[in-house]
């Protein structure tokens, strides 16, 4: 299942929409809830990011993200 993570690189400042970045994770989970938990654990262990929101993507959403040219799976 593919997840899109919205985050701030600087976790010492209040989040601002203008500085929000996104990354994509491909996780082997059975449910969306398991994926959100696993994504938060991976990000906490491997980054200092301030995670704002995590959402699973449908196949159609993945295709749209690929068309925008910014789709790249992040691995830790």
Curated annotation (Swiss-Prot):
E.C. number(s) listed in UniProt: 2.7.7.6
Keyword Nucleus in record: no
Domain of life (superkingdom): Bacteria
Tagged with keyword NADP: no
GO biological process terms held by the UniProt record: DNA-templated transcription
This protein's UniProt keywords: DNA-directed RNA polymerase, Nucleotidyltransferase, Transcription, Transferase
Reactions it catalyzes: RNA(n) + a ribonucleoside 5'-triphosphate = RNA(n+1) + diphosphate
InterPro entries, alphabetized: RpoY (IPR009907)
GO MF term set: DNA binding; DNA-directed RNA polymerase activity
GO cellular component: DNA-directed RNA polymerase complex
Broad EC category: transferase
Family, per entry: Belongs to the RNA polymerase subunit epsilon family.
HAMAP family in the record: RNApol_bact_RpoY
Function description: A non-essential component of RNA polymerase (RNAP).
Protein name: DNA-directed RNA polymerase subunit epsilon
Source species of the chain: Lactococcus lactis subsp. cremoris (strain MG1363)
Top-level taxonomy: Bacteria, Bacillati, Bacillota, Bacilli, Lactobacillales
Gene: rpoY
């Amino acid at each position: 299942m593919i997840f899109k993570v919205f985050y701030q690189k600087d976790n010492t400042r209040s989040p601002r929409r203008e500085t929000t970045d996104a990354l994509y994770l491909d996780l082997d989970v059975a449910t969306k809830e398991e994926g959100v938990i696993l994504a938060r654990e991976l990000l906490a262990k491997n980054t200092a990011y301030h995670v704002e929101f995590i959402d699973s993507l449908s196949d159609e959403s993945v295709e749209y993200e690929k068309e925008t040219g910014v789709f790249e799976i992040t691995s830790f």
